């Protein structure tokens, strides 16, 4: 459900993550300090820009790429990265394409990437860095140790944010069962959920860039977040105005800047509450989030429950017969819902103590 703002970048990072044959070849060139220019793609549009060089048409190998980079020209690889098509070639892109790069190699790489939409990699001889271009994207690959340090720092930050979110959500749980939740409590929980998910997105990019070396970070991340995003979406479904689409609201919240996310009044407007006091406005949940915590209750049954009772308190107050009348709920499931909500309430109240 997250908006993939940098989906293209993530795909690029996966191709050249540490441990991949392509990254091994790039690292070899970097260590040799020869510099290099590689283009990934074999479409007619790309091959039209290639002038001269040697037709290699050989299987890809990190050591082959390293040896071929000793020559001045560009190396053209097939789009599936299985073949080296040609080496020592000159790339001649449209010179009218604007670029803010300075070195000849990087200017060419930027223009070819913009003109063809292909991945072009420039390895600087003097600065000893690898720069990746694709369309309008430019990304400098960093050393694994730097990324690992940043990922660990982000995990520590995430841990603190998750602890705050848990406190906010636990408080909201208590208020929901007492039916005294305010708009302030709800938008605070939505805000905290989105803050956590933004850090998660950042860590996921680090994991992608680390490749094989990111497995431990990935395991720690999975342990920390569990069902944070799902709960955040259900929270929106519980409290947004009935005439609004929860998916559109979630996308809108994701599109907010960091400053806008801090504005609780702005968040309340997004879920449909305009010009009302946050602290004094009591709102009741529909029950999506709480009922979802009961084991073995299908989503279509939850939909039917909410459609019939409209509020969590009405579901809790309903008799077995009233629950049994809802489509998809028999006697056994009615008992499971009643007992499940009772156990949830007891557990939440015990956690408070």
From Swiss-Prot:
Residues where ATP binds: 73, 91, 104-108
HAMAP family membership: DisA (MF_01438)
The UniProt record lists the keyword Secreted: no
Recorded catalytic activity of this chain's protein: 2 ATP = 3',3'-c-di-AMP + 2 diphosphate
Any GO molecular function: diadenylate cyclase activity
Keyword entries, A-Z: ATP-binding, DNA damage, DNA repair, DNA-binding, Magnesium, Nucleotide-binding, Nucleotidyltransferase, Transferase
Cofactor(s) for this UniProt protein: Mg(2+)
Description of how the protein assembles with itself and partners: Homooctamer.
Entry EC no(s): 2.7.7.85
InterPro entries referenced in this protein's UniProt entry, alphabetically: DisA, DisA_sf, DNA_integrity_DisA_N_sf, DNA_integrity_scan_DisA_link, DNA_integrity_scan_DisA_N, DNA_integrity_scanning_protein, RuvA_2-like
GO BP: DNA repair
Protein name: DNA integrity scanning protein DisA
Free-text function comment from the UniProt entry: Participates in a DNA-damage check-point that is active prior to asymmetric division when DNA is damaged. DisA forms globular foci that rapidly scan along the chromosomes during sporulation, searching for lesions. When a lesion is present, DisA pauses at the lesion site. This triggers a cellular response that culminates in a temporary block in sporulation initiation.
Family as reported in the entry's similarity comment: Belongs to the DisA family.
Keyword Transferase tagged: yes
Residue ranges annotated for the DAC domain, each copy included: 6-144
């Amino acid at each position: 459900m997250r908006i993939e703002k940098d989906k293209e970048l993530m795909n690029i990072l996966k191709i050249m993550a540490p441990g991949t044959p392509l990254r091994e070849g790039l690292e070899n060139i970097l260590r040799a300090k020869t510099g290099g220019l590689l283009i990934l793609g074999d479409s007619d549009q790309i091959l039209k820009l290639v002038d001269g060089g040697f037709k290699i048409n050989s299987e890809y190998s990190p050591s082959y790429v390293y040896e071929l980079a000793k020559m001045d020209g560009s190396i053209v690889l097939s789009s599936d990265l299985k073949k080296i098509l040609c080496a020592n070639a000159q790339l001649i892109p449209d010179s009218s394409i604007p670029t803010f790069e300075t070195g000849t190699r990087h200017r060419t790489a930027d223009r070819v990437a913009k003109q063809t939409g292909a991945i072009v990699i420039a390895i600087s001889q003097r600065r000893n860095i690898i720069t990746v271009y694709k369309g309008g994207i430019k990304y400098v690959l960093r050393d694994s140790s730097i990324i690992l340090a940043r990922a660990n720092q982000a995990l520590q930050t995430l841990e603190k944010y998750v602890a705050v979110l848990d406190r906010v959500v636990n408080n909201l749980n208590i208020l929901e069962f007492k039916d005294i939740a305010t708009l302030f409590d709800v938008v605070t929980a939505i805000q905290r959920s989105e803050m956590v998910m933004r850090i998660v997105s950042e860590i996921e990019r680090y994991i992608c860039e680390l490749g094989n070396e990111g497995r431990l970070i990935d395991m720690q991340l999975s342990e920390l977040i569990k069902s944070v995003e799902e709960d955040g979406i259900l929270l929106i479904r519980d409290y947004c105005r009935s005439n609004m689409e929860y998916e559109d609201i979630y996308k809108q919240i994701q599109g907010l800047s960091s400053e806008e996310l801090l504005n609780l009044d702005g968040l309340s407007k997004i879920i449909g509450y305009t010009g009302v006091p946050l602290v004094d406005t009591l709102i009741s949940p529909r029950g999506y989030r709480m009922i979802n915590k009961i084991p073995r209750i299908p989503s279509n049954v939850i939909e039917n429950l909410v459609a019939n009772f409209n509020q969590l308190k009405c579901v809790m107050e309903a008799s077995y017969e009233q629950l049994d009348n809802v489509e998809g709920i028999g006697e056994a499931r009615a008992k499971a819902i009643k007992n499940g909500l009772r156990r949830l309430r007891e557990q939440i109240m015990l956690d408070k103590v």
